[in-house]
Amino acid sequence: MSYNRVNGQPAKLHREQFQPLTFDQADKKADSVLTLMTTDEKISLVGGDRSFFIRPLPRLNLQEVYMSDATQGVHIREKFRDIDLSKYQLEKSTSFPAPISLAATWNPELSYQYAEAVGEECRAGGIGILLGPGTNAYRQSQCGRNFEYFGEDPFLRAQMIKEYVKGVQSTGTVATLKHFVANNTDYYRRRSNSVVDERALHEIYLPAFKAGIDAGAKAVMTSYNLLNGEWCGQSETVINDILRKQLGFRWLVMTDWWSVYDGEKLAKSGQDLEMPLAVALKHADSLIQDGKVEVSDINRMAKSILRTYFSMKFDEMKRDTSYYGNFEDHERTALQTAREGIVLLKNDGNILPITEKSKTILLTGDYVDKLAVGGGSAQVKGYNNRLMIDELKK
């Protein structure tokens, strides 16, 4: 069951908490379906469909699964490159304070409720996989995606992300830890090489991912960058050795969009799903014929997708618009996050020349008359937005 944790209010029951199938239960169901699939069907499954979907297989009664960004709420994307996505979109979605603000609350319980609300909004839109939380370290202030992340401190990130994962997945929505790993800049992000030694990797970059994995995260997205000279999305060192063996991750691994280049390396790396479609694996059948990729490699990839699919009961999932009834709770959670994340400085020594007699205050800057929000795939527009200048005039 899920609870209202804001402001220490009494626990408020919304509905029964989602219970996934165990690894062994899901593995057994995946095996039973895999034996019925043709090689062509397996190849089609390991490449994304229409940019944001796990491909459906109607012959085997497997429905499509829609994915959506991001960490601070649901990005409403009605259309993308002539692909109609309106079937899976919300009438509105709550724009929560950025995760960097959530981290500033130092409140893991609030992280749970924040994420639970995001998960409920995913369910209202029929979204099975949330492409968040952003789990990277805030290493460079120039990184344009820092607002999606939980700061620079490994311990704080780990504590907040652990509860975030639990909150999202309590609703039956998959949480996706991203971007694995050491993805600290978006400048030349497809060519950026993060050179990181073992100690720094394990002390700074991995703890938050490990916490999310231990909390039960069902998906990990690999990153655009190279780690020590290897593209993360097709690196056996990154995926098989670090993610799967060292961190113990056993569920779905997907690429970031258009981030892999070598189908043979991808199939051998431990990667499962190439997004947004099969590019490196476009000619997987030829790679198999040439002996560069084994059918067993494709079987492993397809089985991992199916295992996650069945664990999260996507074969039973339906859009649940009754969650719109919880949006007022979500608004209160967003407000509480903003309140707890604020750092208020006292005006000692009258550093700001404002007194009780002051009648006029100059408010200037780019965001006086518009909202300060992060952009790109993580942007959440929200609704009933209020501008700073309008509030100060009241």
Each language-model region and where it sits:
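Glycoside hydrolase catalytic-domain context in secreted enzymes
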Residues: S2-K394
